């Protein structure tokens, strides 16, 4: 390995089982090595339907005979907190979204056929927040405190054949605050019931790496873990077949050996792929590895794994390289909530997030600050995102009163093990993060006695030199860092390990350990140019940048005045507007503007890229404000999924598509001085016109990624024209809007899948008589749905709104709001009607079709 360069040859894909969406991927059933007509005994069923739920505790609900007839019937995934009211009294605080917590119980009754006696049944949870305990027929199967980890239990010894079985789950999210952002409450990710024969591939039981790759061939290393849960030793053959995207076999191998009773055995194999198609950002090509376990002519198991082949390296001088091409990671950080849907996982909602980001030019996701839903990584595999996969937000030292720190010593190895095994086959995952802004960076940093808001802020200000590691010192915190990195490398030596650090000094205990492969800074732009000198031969990435603050649709002038909010971390901050300007002139004291980071990354080859804080607004952490603010201002896109103006800055810098974005709106007081900004690309110059009169030609330069004019408002039109070599290539016009007159409904899709889960996100706009958006409209819009659909949620992107997310009405916020329609599980049409007092109503029809 070259000094200062980390080179990696990767990699496999996410784990696929049975016939539905599996842990991290799509489910398929494919043959391998021999007759594809042989049926695998493996089945994996969606176990989300028809649960009963009760919010409250003190029950004997674990017992199978408990009467739950009056409990609510619902389908998972489910987040009970998002259904509640915002309140200053909720112990989650504004940092946790000011939504309720509590204890909840879930119960499901099911039966298993006696013909399946001898099969192995497991219940698999993708994530339960938090402190879950699972019971089958009154028997406790175990507890899992960490709310972001996937886990499973063996049901087999406790099942009753041809009789009712009762699965009960207690979820305890009563002790709060336990998170610095909105966590959600309940079984908020998918649940699966798997059935296998006694000899089968273990959970997350394949591991695919690439030992070499060039244009002619790639050599894949396979490790398959088999479990023999029978009473006898068995001679088996593991057949591994790699298939291309069209289902054609491109490589095959087989190995035979003995699987001892009651034990696991690992089969190692190698495949050679001729003329491999590489996984890349723009062409995320996926193969499928089909693993078949045979005993003579009997198929004991069939298991599939999507595989992506690619190479990447991180270099201390040249940054990030993917498949031999120097590439900047243009990434964003993302928390896990889905706006008005809360934490409850929905594949289409996650896909929408990623589509909006991809259109912006984003190519990277940082999973902040916890293991993500498997569906997110599966989508990143298929859509071409570079993922920084993160394990923890805290280690032993807590950031909030009741967070994971109290479980860390007992549970971190188990959780880290399950996290790495689950995610290590995803081609999108290129780096592990073992922590974010952990207090172990310093010798003695405690947040025990601070409020949640103060704890968030103290993390991002400097600490005295006495709290840093001394030269040659091997502190407890450095030793813990070494332990965690060693643990990760033992499970996956193919990827680098980093941590998001907000102490840039080389005396940072994590840095002093010497084991982090990549130096990662959260913020501290002024220190970044010194990284090559302070950390020679270490690759570098900005793990978190900016923390710029914006409210969609709100503008504070003059735009060249910078607002640094909050003014002090130890004092409460308030501004009567509870808003932040969209001019790129407001950020936190430890952060910076979007333009500053874009230029820094552009001008320094050693910077591998950045993950902007954040791609979307999220519930909770409403910095710089406290109550009644309850969601963030950090996003490039607001909570409802509406891009803020800065979205088009990134689009102009990160893509080659034509961009011409003029803002703000053109509804002001006559004679008022207005700052008009423009983001553009693919042009030499832009010229602004007010009612046909030129306001001058402007050109960007290396120091300014936007242009601006200060003009006096007069009703009419403001227009910008972009020219390339003197030729007009684009133009944008904004008209002064009149009084609100009508509603416009715009769906993101007109045809849904009739699966009971698919969603249509409908943008609701208030227009004047001429069809212009009314930029200050706040009309209350009422919704009704008839036919095959229902309202899954409503939003408008307002961080201060006290309106419920689960409702049939929403006020417009700067002219817009959102209604989300969910299919009811049947094919047909749903008719959405939107009404508002004094406005013409709008009607939209949405179709749903069977797969």
From Swiss-Prot:
GO CC annotations on file: plasma membrane
Subcellular location: Cell inner membrane
Annotated signal sequence range: 1-19
Entry GO MF terms: beta-galactosidase activity
pH dependence: Optimum pH is 6.0-7.0.
Lipidation sites (S-diacylglycerol cysteine): 20
Function according to Swiss-Prot or TrEMBL: Catalyzes the hydrolysis of terminal non-reducing beta-D-galactose residues in beta-D-galactosides in xyloglucan degradation, converting 'L' units to 'X' units.
Family, as annotated: Belongs to the glycosyl hydrolase 2 family.
Name of the featured protein: Beta-galactosidase BoGH2A
């Amino acid at each position: 390995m070259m000094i200062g360069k980390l080179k990696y040859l990767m990699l496999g894909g996410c784990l696929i089982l049975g016939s539905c969406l599996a842990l991290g991927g799509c489910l398929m059933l494919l043959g391998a090595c021999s007759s594809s007509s042989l049926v695998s005994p493996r089945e994996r069923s969606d176990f989300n339907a028809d649960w009963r739920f009760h919010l409250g505790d003190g029950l004997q609900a674990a017992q199978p005979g408990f009467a739950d007839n009056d409990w609510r019937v619902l389908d998972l995934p489910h987040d009970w907190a998002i259904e509640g009211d915002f309140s200053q009294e909720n112990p989650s605080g504004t940092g946790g979204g000011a939504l309720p917590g509590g204890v909840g119980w879930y119960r499901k009754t099911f039966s298993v056929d006696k013909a399946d006696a001898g099969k192995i049944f497991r219940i698999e949870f993708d994530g339960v927040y938090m402190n879950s305990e699972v019971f089958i027929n009154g028997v406790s199967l175990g507890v899992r405190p960490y709310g972001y980890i996937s886990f499973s239990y063996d049901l087999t010894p406790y099942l009753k054949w041809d009789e009712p079985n009762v699965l009960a789950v207690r979820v305890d999210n009563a002790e709060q605050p336990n998170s610095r952002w909105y966590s959600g409450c309940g079984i908020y990710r998918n649940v699966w019931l798997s059935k296998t024969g006694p000899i089968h591939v273990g959970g997350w039981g394949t591991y695919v790496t690439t030992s070499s790759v060039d244009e002619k061939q790639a050599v894949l290393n396979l490790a398959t873990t088999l479990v023999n849960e029978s009473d006898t030793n068995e001679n088996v053959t593991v057949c591994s077949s790699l298939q291309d995207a069209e289902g054609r076999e491109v490589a095959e191998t087989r190995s035979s050996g003995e699987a001892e009773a009651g034990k696991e055995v690992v089969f190692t194999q190698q495949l050679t792929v001729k003329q491999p198609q590489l996984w890349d950002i723009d062409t995320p090509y996926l193969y499928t590895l089909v693993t078949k376990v045979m005993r003579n002519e009997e198929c004991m198991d069939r298991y599939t794994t999507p595989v992506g082949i690619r190479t990447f390296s991180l270099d201390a001088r040249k940054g990030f390289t993917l498949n031999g091409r120097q590439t900047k990671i243009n990434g964003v950080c993302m928390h896990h909530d889905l706006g008005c849907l809360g934490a409850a996982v929905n594949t289409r909602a996650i896909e929408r997030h990623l589509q909006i980001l991809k259109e912006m030019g984003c190519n990277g996701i940082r999973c902040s600050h916890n293991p993500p839903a498997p569906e997110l990584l599966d989508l990143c595999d298929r859509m071409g995102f570079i993922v920084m996969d993160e394990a923890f937000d805290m280690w032993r030292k807590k950031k909030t009163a009741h967070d994971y720190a109290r479980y860390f010593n007992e549970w971190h190895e188990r959780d880290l093990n399950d996290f790495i095994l689950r995610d290590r086959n995803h081609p999108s995952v290129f780096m592990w993060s073992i922590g974010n802004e952990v207090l172990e960076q310093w010798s003695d940093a405690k947040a025990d006695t601070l409020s949640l808001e103060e704890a968030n802020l103290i993390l991002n200000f400097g600490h005295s030199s006495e709290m840093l590691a001394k030269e040659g010192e091997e502190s407890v915190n450095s030793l813990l860092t070494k332990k965690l990195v060693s643990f990760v490398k033992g499970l996956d030596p193919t990827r680098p390990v980093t941590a998001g650090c907000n102490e840039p000094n080389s005396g940072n205990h994590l840095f002093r350990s010497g084991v982090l492969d990549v130096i990662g800074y959260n913020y501290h732009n002024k220190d970044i140019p010194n990284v090559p000198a302070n950390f020679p031969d270490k690759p570098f990435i900005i793990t978190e940048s900016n923390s710029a603050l914006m409210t969609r649709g709100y503008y504070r002038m003059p735009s060249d005045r910078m607002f640094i909010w909050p003014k002090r971390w130890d004092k409460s901050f308030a501004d009567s507007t509870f808003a932040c300007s969209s001019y790129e002139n407001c950020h936190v004291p430890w952060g910076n503007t979007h333009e500053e980071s874009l230029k820094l990354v552009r001008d320094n080859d050693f910077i591998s890229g950045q993950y902007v804080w954040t791609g979307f607004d999220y519930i909770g952490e409403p910095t710089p404000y406290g109550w009644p603010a309850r969601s963030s201002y950090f996003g490039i896109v607001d909570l409802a999924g509406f891009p803020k103006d800065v979205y088009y800055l990134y689009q102009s810098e990160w893509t080659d598509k034509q961009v011409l974005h003029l803002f703000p709106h053109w509804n002001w007081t006559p004679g008022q001085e207005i700052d008009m900004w423009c983001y553009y690309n693919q042009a030499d110059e832009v010229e602004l016109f007010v009612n046909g009169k030129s306001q001058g030609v402007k050109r960007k330069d290396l120091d300014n990624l936007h242009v601006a004019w200060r003009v006096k408002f007069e009703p009419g039109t403001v227009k910008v024209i972009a020219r390339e070599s003197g030729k007009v290539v684009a133009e944008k016009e904004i008209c002064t809007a009149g009084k609100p007159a009508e509603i416009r409904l715009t769906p993101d899709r007109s045809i849904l899948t009739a699966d009971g889960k698919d969603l249509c996100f409908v943008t609701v706009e208030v227009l004047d008589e001429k069809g212009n958006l009314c930029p200050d409209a706040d009309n209350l819009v009422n919704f009704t749905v008839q036919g095959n659909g229902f309202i899954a949620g409503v939003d408008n992107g307002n961080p201060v709104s006290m309106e419920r997310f689960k409702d049939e009405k929403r006020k417009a916020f700067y002219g817009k709001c959102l209604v989300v329609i969910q299919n009811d599980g049947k094919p047909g049409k749903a008719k959405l009607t939107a009404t508002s007092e004094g406005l013409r109503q709008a009607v939209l029809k949405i179709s749903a079709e069977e797969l």
